[in-house]
Amino acid sequence: MKETRVAYRYAKSLIDLAAENGVLDRVNADMAGIESVFKQNHQLVAVMKNPIVQGDKKHAILEALFGGKVDNFTMSLLSLLTKKHREAVVFEISSEFQRQYREKMGIKIVEVTTTQPITEDQRANFKAIMASKASKVELIEKIDEKILGGFVLKMDDQQIDESVIAKLNKIKNKFTEQVINY
């Protein structure tokens, strides 16, 4: 809970500063990259959360990983976090920043699940389907062979399930109802 509040505040401040200085999109790209690095490297997360590792060593690690590769605002945030002994929440801040960025920009996340990778035409069709629900859409593609075919679209609390397994289950339920009612 405490980490969430801290992450929210730092992310909000960074969004405000980046927007004021016209570097919001660059900083968002940086935060996405930072989140990706932390997701892929659990040892990095462990080091950042380890109270035994000194702050200057953590700063050196962050500098080596991101120095010269991210915007000055982003690097300043990372430096500030190590000075304030908040490096343990870098991952949470990057995730929260992206959530707030999407909210600010009116971008909705749409999860599309299929049995195989989708084509550009299909991607455009899925975006068109969701265009009535949101002006800007970010697709997250997932592969799940359990749906047997078709697709499942999820946005917020809405779901469009056009999968083969859902249709088979619907037929099964109708058949079961008819047998019971017979």
UniProtKB/Swiss-Prot annotation:
It is a peripheral membrane protein. InterPro entries: ATP_synth_OSCP/delta_N_sf, ATPase_OSCP/dsu. SUPFAM superfamilies: N-terminal domain of the delta subunit of the F1F0-ATP synthase. Keywords: ATP synthesis, Cell inner membrane, Cell membrane, CF(1), Hydrogen ion transport, Ion transport, Membrane, Transport. The keyword Transport applies. It is found in: Cell inner membrane. One of its GO terms (cellular component) is plasma membrane. Its main location: membrane. One of its GO terms (molecular function) is proton-transporting ATP synthase activity, rotational mechanism. The keyword Chaperone does not apply. It comes from the Bacteria. F-type ATPases have 2 components, F(1) - the catalytic core - and F(0) - the membrane proton channel. F(1) has five subunits: alpha(3), beta(3), gamma(1), delta(1), epsilon(1). F(0) has three main subunits: a(1), b(2) and c(10-14). The alpha and beta chains form an alternating ring which encloses part of the gamma chain. F(1) is attached to F(0) by a central stalk formed by the gamma and epsilon chains, while a peripheral stalk is formed by the delta and b chains. Belongs to the ATPase delta chain family. F(1)F(0) ATP synthase produces ATP from ADP in the presence of a proton or sodium gradient. F-type ATPases consist of two structural domains, F(1) containing the extramembraneous catalytic core and F(0) containing the membrane proton channel, linked together by a central stalk and a peripheral stalk. During catalysis, ATP synthesis in the catalytic domain of F(1) is coupled via a rotary mechanism of the central stalk subunits to proton translocation. NCBIfam families: ATP_synt_delta (TIGR01145). This is ATP synthase subunit delta. It comes from Cytophaga hutchinsonii (strain ATCC 33406 / DSM 1761 / CIP 103989 / NBRC 15051 / NCIMB 9469 / D465).
